[in-house]
Amino acid sequence: MGKSPSSLDATIVAQAPCRVDLAGGTIDLWPLYLFHPGALTLNFAVNILTECRITPLRGKRIELRSLDTRKHEVFSSFDALMRARNYRLPLPARVIQFFAPKEGFLIETNSESPAGAGISGSSALMIAATAALARFTERHLTLEQMRVIAQNIEAQIINVPTGCQDYYPALYGGI
């Protein structure tokens, strides 16, 4: 099923806040929390946002652009993206692989959090990209489903287990 001409004009925007961790850190990783009954993590969302914007394109071309890192990649199709061995922008590329969109688009990301700042900018990016691509591919996901997708993809990319606490502020805000 292709996108209608009117939907080619519809840009999708998703934003997610970063977070500050006060206590608990990695105690939410399995099986660590099993060894510390009653342990809690405490963090809160901050007004430092990560944004993902998807603009439909005619044809099959997929463009990835990070405004904050000034990186850019272009693939002639989803199949070309799947065949690539390395990516300049691995986080959005892997989320795109998961959702397997049928149409071409431009995905632009921008984070107010500098890379390596320790406030879960990558987790916020994963949530924003997951939300935007879910809308673009017309998938109706719960917030918990988005968390599981983002968390598992990021763990695969960084080859390190990831806990839940980085993703909840990006999904729900607050403390």
Name each region found by the language model.
Residues 2-121, 131-141, 172-175:
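ATP-binding N-lobe of GHMP and related small-molecule kinases
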Residues 88, 126, 146:
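Hydrophobic (often cysteine-bearing) scaffold residues that line and stabilize catalytic clefts
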Residues 121, 125, 138, 142, ...:
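Short, contiguous, pocket-lining structural segments
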Residues 143-175:
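Alpha/beta catalytic cores of group-transfer enzymes, especially the acyltransferase/condensing modules
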